[in-house]
């Protein structure tokens, strides 16, 4: 059996550009792409923390070290500059890979869209 699992996540990235007439749907700083294990043309889901919008598109490379998160084409209508978003990708993972210790790549970034940490799991949510 295969399971559809979280593969990659870039958590709380700030939108730096919204380019309605640019080809390609989400340009992501190449450093962030690599850290999250994402590649060009990979399907991604974007969840806008500010307005609740959720949509799918694909990743393209943004300038390395720039902190770029550019929503392009129709995706530009789903956010405003400065909105915080979560960018995620999923993969089909078989039971053997899961048993062997397969883990997602979670990337946490600072206010300038620079990497501040990595994790391979989402912590248990507690009632507090």
Curated annotation (Swiss-Prot):
Cofactor annotation: pyruvate
GO MF term list: aspartate 1-decarboxylase activity
Pathway annotation: Cofactor biosynthesis; (R)-pantothenate biosynthesis; beta-alanine from L-aspartate: step 1/1
Any one biological process term the GO annotation gives: alanine biosynthetic process
Subcellular localization: Cytoplasm
Keyword flag Membrane: no
Catalytic reaction annotation: L-aspartate + H(+) = beta-alanine + CO2
Major subcellular location class: cytoplasm
Catalytic center residues: 25 (schiff-base intermediate with substrate), 58 (proton donor)
Modification Pyruvic acid (Ser), positions: 25
Annotated InterPro entries: Asp_de-COase-like_dom_sf, Asp_decarbox
CC annotations in GO: cytosol
Post-translational modification: Is synthesized initially as an inactive proenzyme, which is activated by self-cleavage at a specific serine bond to produce a beta-subunit with a hydroxyl group at its C-terminus and an alpha-subunit with a pyruvoyl group at its N-terminus.
Record NCBIfam families: panD
Subunit details: Heterooctamer of four alpha and four beta subunits.
Protein name: Aspartate 1-decarboxylase
Organism: Burkholderia cenocepacia (strain HI2424)
Lineage summary: Bacteria, Pseudomonadati, Pseudomonadota, Betaproteobacteria, Burkholderiales
């Amino acid at each position: 059996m295969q399971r559809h699992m979280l593969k990659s996540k870039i958590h709380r990235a700030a939108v730096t550009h919204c380019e309605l007439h640019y080809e390609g749907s989400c340009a992501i700083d190449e450093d962030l792409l690599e850290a999250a294990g994402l590649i060009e043309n990979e399907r991604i889901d974007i969840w806008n923390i500010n307005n609740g919008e959720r949509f799918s598109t694909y990743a393209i490379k943004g300038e390395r070290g720039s902190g770029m998160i550019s929503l392009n084409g129709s995706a530009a209508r789903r956010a405003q500059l400065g909105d915080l978003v979560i960018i995620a990708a999923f993969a089909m993972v078989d039971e053997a890979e899961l048993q062997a210790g397969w883990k997602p790549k979670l990337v946490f970034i600072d206010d300038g869209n620079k990497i501040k940490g990595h994790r391979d799991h989402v912590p248990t949510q507690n009632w507090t």
